[in-house]
Amino acid sequence: MLAFIRNAFAAPAPRDTHPAIQPPAPVGVALRRWAAALLCMLAGATWAQGQAPDPVVRFGILPLGGAFESRNDWEPLLADLSRAIGRPVSVLSVTSYEALEQAIQRNEVDMAFLSGKMALDAVSQRRMTVVAQVTRHDGLPGYRALLLSRKAPPFNSLQGLLAEPERWRLARGENRSLSGFIVPQLQFFLPNHIAMETRFRSEVVGTHQATALAVANGEADVATNNTADFERFKLQFPVEAARLQTLWESDLIAHAQLVVRRDYPPEFRRKVQTFLTAYARSNGPRGDAERAVLKSLHDFAGFVAADNRSLLPAATLAAQLARQNAMTAQWVNEAARQARLQRIDRSYAEQLAVLRDGGS
């Protein structure tokens, strides 16, 4: 039975180079984790008696902190989701955007928490559809990308960064990350004639937690991050956070989405959406327990119903970055550059047509 519980979730990814400090879980969250294990045991007992199980729903998690930490954070919510939809839910928690993208390509993910470019690709290329979007307590429709540096000199001013980027060591997110790469590149670096991939002394690529730690510990000089993850970082690593300052922040970026495979019938997707939008909205002990779950889960306020149109801003950002890169790249001739720009525009138009349909 213990082996069954272990196998109910994806195998743990390699340990982070900067493991998160794990505070004791709130009582409500701990009870939900115990309930998740009990649910798995009961399910295993039923299957052992020869009854055919419902197919497991495989849930993929965008890597925001460590893989193990992310899985622990999501387990209570997914245990509640499992009860609501009447199916077991397993967790795939990975250490990189690329690993999650590959799992989606291999059809190993049925439902996922994604943001920006990854959600856009899942909808436009991988037959998934948006059912809900995260909300936060500040009430804003999004978050902002940040550039972080240490407070102490010498690498602590925006003017210094712009003047001599080749002296700075960069810690950034993967190329699919909106706040970790796409938005800083599009809104700050390229307008200042700096290409993130080539102008810095060195670079480290990792999660927002890893990039912030790299700067705080002197392993890098400037890091991409975002307002939501930096607030969480301040709670988990107060000593390291006290060494950091914000050099720059972006325009608002739309919050992350939850996507489900279109292969599932509409009634199943509606059931998932109904569960998410009602979660933590009720009064009393149940609502309090659910709000405790969301607080431990990146301090979410809840979820709102959404469809593929919520990805229109992400599509625009991705197309703008692709055009900027095409304009600044070296080409054999101008005709080759124009051909690339035309392909970008055609792809963008096709994406808009898919997204404006909303999904069904």
Where is each model-derived feature located?
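Bacterial N-terminal signal peptides that target proteins for export
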Residues: 4-35
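Bacterial N-terminal signal peptides
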Residues: 33-45
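Boundary at the C-terminal end of the N-terminal hydrophobic targeting segment
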Residues: 46-50
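Bilobed "Venus flytrap"/periplasmic-binding protein-like clamshell domains
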Residues: 54, 58-82, 94, 140-213
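Periplasmic-binding protein-like
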Residues: 58-63, 136-146, 238-273, 291-307
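An extracytoplasmic/periplasmic, membrane-proximal ligand-sensing/linker region
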Residues: 65-66, 72, 76, 271-360
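Short helices/loops that flank or line small-molecule/ion binding pockets
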Residues: 98-112, 125, 143, 208-223
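A ligand-binding cleft/hinge motif common to bilobed small-molecule-binding domains
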Residues: 116-126, 189-190, 216-217, 221-242
